[in-house]
Swiss-Prot record:
Gene Ontology CC entries for this record: blood microparticle; haptoglobin-hemoglobin complex; hemoglobin complex
Domain of life the protein comes from: Eukaryota
Name of this protein: Hemoglobin subunit alpha
Phylogenetic placement of the source organism: Eukaryota, Metazoa, Chordata, Craniata, Vertebrata
Tissue expression as described in the entry: Red blood cells.
Family that this chain belongs to: Belongs to the globin family.
Entry's Gene Ontology molecular function annotations: haptoglobin binding; heme binding; iron ion binding; organic acid binding; oxygen binding; oxygen carrier activity; peroxidase activity
Signal peptide: none
Organism: Chelidonichthys kumu
Length: 142
């Protein structure tokens, strides 16, 4: 679980990087689609899966809206993200393993874009946050 220190670390980083959330989301999604090509199966309705495509950029933005919501609901992610969990489980039918893949890509992009802010201690806290976020999004799969 997240300690108070972890939560404060994540909130402090989010305050610094949230202005770039759209770019982070699009870059992370594009990276996931490239590095883990099996994830493309959820986006077969898109004609262009390239990093510069409008669809990738828009969905990257939506992902980061969800991350922002998670930051604001960090004290109870399971309850705070219940609607998102239901949507991904029942409507979109996303394999919950993909949340971990995307989390990894988000960590990579944040570390590239914000190397000074993303030291080892921050990395640990953000990684724990994303693990808890993935777990909360997987809640309705049980």
């Amino acid at each position: 679980s997240l300690s108070d220190k972890d939560k404060n670390t994540v909130r402090a980083l989010w305050a610094k990087i949230s202005k770039s959330a759209d770019v982070i989301g699009a870059e992370a999604l594009a990276r996931m689609l490239t590095v883990y090509p099996q994830t493309k199966t959820y986006f077969t309705h898109w004609t262009d899966l390239s990093p510069s495509s409008t669809s990738v950029k828009n969905h990257g933005k939506n992902i980061m809206v969800g991350v922002s919501l998670a930051v604001s609901k960090m004290d109870d992610l399971t309850a705070g993200l219940l609607e998102l969990s239901e949507k991904h489980a029942f409507q979109l039918r996303v394999d919950p393993a993909n949340f971990k893949l995307l989390s990894h890509c988000l960590l990579v992009v944040i570390s590239i874009m914000f190397p000074k802010e993303f030291g080892p201690e921050v990395h640990v806290s953000v990684d724990k946050f994303f693990a808890n976020l993935a777990l909360a999004l997987s809640e309705r799969y049980r």
